[in-house]
Amino acid sequence: MIGAAYAQLSAVSYGVGDFVGGVAARRVAALRVMLVSYPIAAVLLGVLAISAGGPVRSGAVLWGSLYGISQAIGVWWFYAALGAGPISVVSPLAAVLNAAVPVAAGVAFGERPGQTACVGVVLAMLAVFLVGRESPDDEDVRTHRFTRKVAWLTIGAGVAFGLDFVLLHQAPVECRLWPLFFARVSATVLVFAVARATGNFQLPSKIPLRLAVAAALLDSCANIAMLMALHAWLLSLASMLISLYPAATVV
């Protein structure tokens, strides 16, 4: 199915993007990485939205903006958790929450996947946890402990990521890529405001800068593929397949 293909493309792009962003966040503050990646993604998605056409409706602005804010918060907290805590714990916990929220929302909205699909969802949930795990590295665990702060950052990031699917799923189909453009614009405004308030309003340089640019390109690809998957498939199934993105991060 075309929805499954889009979901797989989104998962791979998100997974590689998270790895790139996580590496950059271990060199500089997560917000400094996002100061580069988000504006670039906003410009790119704006150009693509104009090319794709489609009307600009209030639903695209509203749901796109809410999605962008939720994703910005999730990425900020996730990068912060990866930078401060053990990846072998942070990644699988965030991934499971990321998968559980949209599945629960889909069922609440009235989606009723078939029996085979339900079994697949359960197995996929287990797979999400397993692929998100890494073999504990003694040095990583010793220098990056799973503190209470890291735990809350991880939980918050997982829930925010899960809400991303739910919010974007509400955007009007006929608006095409416009919800993604408004998402990146709202997220960029939020990131700039928080970065200035926290003293992180400084662009990275050298390797972190290049990694941030790469993360922007991967993020744009992942978002477009996710939007297509959510329009072509059930929320509960598309979100579950996309939630397998930690497999690409680990590989």
Where are these regions (language model features)?
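Membrane-interface interhelical linkers
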Residues: M1-V12, V20-G21, A25-L31, V36-S65, ...
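Hydrophobic core positions of alpha-helical segments in small-molecule transporters
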Residues: L9, V36, L66, V90-A94, ...
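Hydrophobic transmembrane alpha-helices of multi-pass small-molecule transport proteins
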Residues: I40-L45, A100-V103, T116-S135
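Alpha-helical transmembrane segments and their membrane-interface exit regions
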Residues: I69-G74, L123-E134, S186-V194, L244-V251
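Structural motif at transmembrane-helix junctions in multi-pass transporters
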Residues: R26-V33, W77-L93, R112, P172-P179, ...
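Transmembrane alpha-helical core positions of polytopic small-molecule transporters
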Residues: Y14-G15, A41, Y67-V75, N98, ...
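Alpha-helical transmembrane segments of compact multi-pass small-molecule transporters, enriched
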Residues: P39-L45, L93-V107, S186-L190, A222-M226, ...
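Hydrophobic alpha-helical transmembrane segments in multi-pass integral membrane proteins
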Residues: L45-P55, P102-A117, V159-E174, L218-S236
